[in-house]
């Protein structure tokens, strides 16, 4: 199973049902909606299509809303384009004007208060660089030297590297977009241009007011955000390393080390991290990635990222499906080369000690030492699965949760395969349900060794405190099956009706010699029936058929060989009984 998750930006090139199906089958785990572009109506249509296709394919796909953020842009230029020439001067005005080679304006009127003489102003992702020469606050104008020649079009981005900018945490548009996302039940918010913890708290306040359970991933895109990363992470659920604007705001040569540091900090806290921007940029135009791009994706995985993201490659590129397949193949190859024993050792040293982490690290070490097939995490909130994931075990992590929201939010967590299954109230029922669900995924089968981890008592969030090593059971008896289907339950041996009186039979398989009239009312309440009585026309077989209860008859010594409270799998189609949960699907 591929462990690194893939986030795909959905746009004109990928919004059709046909292409979304291809992306999901190719490996997309999370769909990103970029609210810098498009109306609510357009995004609503995309959300509906994504959910329709995901449901048809029975795939868990998370939805990520990426805010436009409090960015600075230029206003419009005369004829849509001007040329700024190196060596000349240009005025940046705080008052809106039609841009010319001599003067243009920006959307942020307080820029004049934030910059100083000598500050740099970068235009259009740094393609044109200006240096502040004079500041005239009376006129609201900043005179700059043009350091290199370049074109400037309408509404291009403006960056102020090294300048503390007093922009609001979120704009009115962001707030409207977030409320739209709440209404549409999105799973993640990627908050653009986060500089300080208060920016995240502004979003969290809206979520709390609306009682929305949406995880927040601040996008670190500037030096101020990097400087405040510890405090930002304290109030965040994850992080996006957005290298596009970051590479403009800080020197490009600093980006790789900043990326490693940000990912490491997230790994230490067990918070998911997405590495984004220009990962396979050339695949917008070409069907094959460059060698440098392949190395970039692989190195992000070696750094410890949970997810890698495609932007223009899937939103507007010519080869969206090929881009996802390429990213998937790079991830699988990179993961195969990992030294998971060393990785676990490094993570054990990195992560702080706590009760929950103690269970997590024990699970990971046990999984490695016993070479278990899978780790099955029964989880309400996703906390158990994230706790295991932070130690990067080689074994598959199967997160069994009753919450569709939790499942989608686990879709971005490294190594976690989320499955939605109705919750169980007792510990035994929870464990049985977890094993049964793991088998249903096809990743666990008869005879496999697995680890089950959960929090008990059940139903309480954030209480991971239990680990169980479990061997998926073997065949213990054989007879003649009646009906079809299979059930898993605890055996209850009955010589007569009195043995069943007053018992809860809702998860029980009745084991008896034969069925008479006194037993029928109890058989109706059970989930399965095993009898020593032989024959397809026997009373036991007839009752099983009439009541639609999976039944196996003609099992010799059933009442002696099968013990009370033993967990058994009854497979009516094959006439077999297994101890524990067996793969009979």
Curated annotation (Swiss-Prot):
Binding-site residues for Mg(2+), renumbered to this chain: 221, 245
Q: Which domain of life is it from?
A: Bacteria
Q: Which NCBIfam families match?
A: PRK05826.1 (NF004491), PRK06354.1 (NF004978), pyruv_kin (TIGR01064)
Q: Where is this site: Transition state stabilizer?
A: 219
Residue positions binding ATP: 34-37, 73, 156
Q: Name one GO molecular function term.
A: potassium ion binding
Q: Which cofactor does it need?
A: Mg(2+); K(+)
Q: Which reaction does it catalyse?
A: pyruvate + ATP = phosphoenolpyruvate + ADP + H(+)
Describe the family membership recorded for this protein in Swiss-Prot or TrEMBL: Belongs to the pyruvate kinase family.
Q: Where, by residue number, does substrate bind?
A: 32, 244-245, 277
Record's protein name: Pyruvate kinase
**From which residue to which does any coiled coil extend?**
none
Q: Which species is this UniProt entry from?
A: Staphylococcus epidermidis (strain ATCC 35984 / DSM 28319 / BCRC 17069 / CCUG 31568 / BM 3577 / RP62A)
